[in-house]
Curated annotation (Swiss-Prot):
GO terms for molecular function: ATP binding; ATP hydrolysis activity; ATP-dependent protein folding chaperone; unfolded protein binding. HAMAP family: HscA. It comes from Delftia acidovorans (strain DSM 14801 / SPH-1). The gene is hscA. GO terms for biological process: iron-sulfur cluster assembly. This is Chaperone protein HscA homolog. It comes from the Bacteria.
Length: 622
């Protein structure tokens, strides 16, 4: 979400020094980090070449954690302590969670009346903010390892439909992860940046973004470097996870299988996800689940999957219709449709979108990566690295903001789809004679009754001079910044008394809570570094063991008996060292095995060369 960037105040860059800035797509299912290198945005892989980081964190006793692929592997065996799709819980209350009994977690409210969701683990109660911070920190470390330097800051993407509470939770997670947040940017907007800069397209475009947990639709007008978001919509509780759940439910009805334990529920959901993914390329796939009650194998046709999830695709298209109506556009006025999010790989989704708009969607860029790439381009600009200042991005606010008036009604101050950053003011007056205070209740939503909208904050303006009802003039000003976050001020015009509040959602984290988490992070920084080194050492050891054992299986016959015995002894020593809590011990054993197999590697190379040259004449090689 950025206006024309010349340079940020206080950030005039040294023209000879490039700041490292990254874009982060904090996704429900997977997360990515990208950066601009040599003028091109690219996603940064981990040390094994993997770009996608599963958005999964496993909590273990004594403060230990597994993040990403290692945690994902434990989803079916330690479901209660392995938290996935935490993005769906960001800024939410327990009442907001749909069917919590179907999830393998033990939920608890952290603080009565504030509603912060906690998930109980063997390492204590964790919030979605803490889980997201672990993922963000992992991506930050990946970027710093790639560049061998600290990063200046990051642009983090959020769904366009995220409300103030969810955006604030994302900012809290970034702070907890030690990331200098340059800006929050809407995911569809990031996709528009990537496509607009890569393809130079102009006209009206729809960005259809179906991720793991959220759906967004944005209608954009692109013209000569200006990106104007003319309307947004979506569903913050619709994504690939829901397709998994619908398929799992349908198969359960067909087979009569009802998973009971948390582990069985997780295995069942994972089996449904794998089956869904297989149906992207196949007409029939087998859902296979190893449950505590026995193994389940059930063939699913793509047509069955499409039928059992058609209502979800229809929900997304209903949001598309609303967004087009808000923009005052007919579907045939849309020149192109951009698909974003891994869930758009489903054939039924692509077919439904193509049929709705009467044209095939654009799939030039990897739908998993396009959001991170756009965020990286924006981060590069905000860091002052980009010499091109010809991109103007006009974003909009997704939900109306207003205040409660007498009778529990909502008076809108800023309407949805208004371009941001923005500020709007409206005058109010007192209700009673001699009234010296005014309560301001800030709400968000499209309904006319306060009870049907989301409460954001409450504050009071005191010190109003006593006067007749209706005589006082109180100006209430709403200001929404470039991140879509709100501050509210109220000022009595005659006396000048005023009050301000930066809206902190009633179920967000307080600054004290964030500070406490940061302090905990500082206190365990050394321990975390040691834990990271230990994990890396064990990974390297496992990799060396697998490579050596594979080589022995293939070419072990080239070794003499005493050579084989020496290598076997080194393997046993390394395998024994993996159980150590000392990274140096494991590293020493790994290096010893590497050194001890050098002559074996040379023998294997000689054999390969001899086999390659067997039967060849000198003339045939010249």
């Amino acid at each position: 979400m950025a206006l024309l960037q010349i340079s940020e105040p206080g950030q005039s860059p040294d023209p000879h020094q490039r700041r490292i800035a990254v874009g982060i797509d904090l996704g429900t299912t997977h997360s990515l980090v990208a950066a601009v290198r040599n003028g091109v945005a690219e996603c940064l892989p981990d040390d094994q070449g993997r770009v996608l980081l599963p958005s999964v964190v496993r909590y273990l006793p004594q403060g230990r954690r597994e993040i990403g692929h290692a945690a994902q592997a434990a989803l079916s065996t330690d479901a209660g302590n392995t938290i996935a799709s935490a993005k769906r819980f960001m800024g939410r209350t327990l009442a907001d969670i749909d069917a919590p009994e179907k999830l393998p977690y033990r939920f608890a409210e952290q603080e009565a009346g504030r509603g912060v969701i906690g998930i109980e683990t063997v390492d204590g109660t964790k919030t979605a903010v803490e889980v997201s911070a672990e993922i963000l920190a992992t991506l930050r470390f990946r970027a710093e390892d790639t560049f061998n330097d600290d990063i200046h800051g990051a642009v983090i993407t959020v769904p366009a439909y995220f409300d103030d509470a969810q955006r604030q939770a994302t900012k809290d997670a970034a702070k907890l992860a030690g990331i200098n947040l340059l800006r929050l940017i809407n995911e569809p907007t990031a996709a528009a940046i990537a496509y607009g800069l890569d393809n130079g397209s102009e006209g009206v475009y729809a960005v259809y973004d179906l991720g793991g947990g959220t759906f967004d639709i944005s209608i954009l007008r692109l013209s000569q470097g200006v990106f104007e978001v003319v309307s947004t919509g979506g569903d913050s509780a619709l994504g690939g996870d829901d397709y998994d759940a619908a398929l799992a439910e349908w198969v359960a009805q067909q087979t009569g299988v009802v998973p009971q334990t948390a582990e069985d529920k997780a295995r069942w959901r994972m089996a449904a996800r794998l089956c869904k993914q297989a149906l992207t390329d196949a007409q029939v796939a087998t859902l296979t689940a190893e449950l505590s009650t026995g193994a389940v194998h059930f063939d699913v046709k793509r047509s069955d999957f499409d039928a059992s999830t058609a209502h979800l695709t229809a929900r997304s298209l209903a949001a598309v219709r609303r967004a087009l109506k808000d923009a005052g556009l007919a579907r045939d006025e849309v020149q192109g449709v951009v698909l974003v999010g891994g869930s758009t790989r489903m054939p039924q989704v692509r077919e439904a979108v193509a049929e709705f708009f009467g044209r095939d969607p654009l799939i030039n860029l990897n739908p998993d990566e396009v959001v991170a790439l756009g965020a990286a381009i924006q981060a590069n600009q905000l860091a002052g690295n980009s010499s091109s200042g010809d991109m103007l991005l006009l974003d909009v606010i997704p939900l109306s903001l207003g205040v409660e008036t007498m009778g529990g009604l909502v008076e809108r101050i800023i309407s949805r789809n208004e371009t941001i950053p923005t500020a709007r003011a409206q005058d109010f007056t007192t209700y009673k004679d001699g009234q010296t205070a005014l309560a301001v209740h800030v709400v968000q939503g499209e309904r006319d009754l306060v009870a049907d909208c989301r409460s954001l904050a409450r504050f009071e303006l005191r010190g109003i001079p006593p006067m007749a009802a209706g005589a006082a003039r109180i100006r209430v000003t709403f200001t929404v910044d470039a991140d879509g976050l709100l501050s509210v001020g109220a000022k009595e015009q005659t006396s000048g008394v005023e009050a301000h509040i930066h809206v902190k959602p009633s179920y967000g984290l307080s600054d004290d809570e964030v500070a406490r988490m940061l302090q905990d992070g500082f206190a365990t920084a050394q321990q975390d570094m040691q834990a990271r080194a230990l994990v890396e050492a064990r990974v390297d050891a496992d990799r060396m063991l697998m490579a050596t054992e594979s080589a022995l299986q293939a070419d072990g016959d080239v070794l003499a008996a005493d050579q084989r015995a020496a290598i076997d002894a080194l393997i046993d020593a390394l395998r024994a060292s993996v159980g150590s809590e000392d990274a140096a011990v494991i590293e020493a054993a790994t290096q010893a095995l590497a050194k001890g197999t050098e002559s074996f590697a040379a023998e294997r190379m000689n054999r390969s060369i001899q086999q390659a040259l067997a039967g060849k004449s000198v003339q045939s090689l010249s």
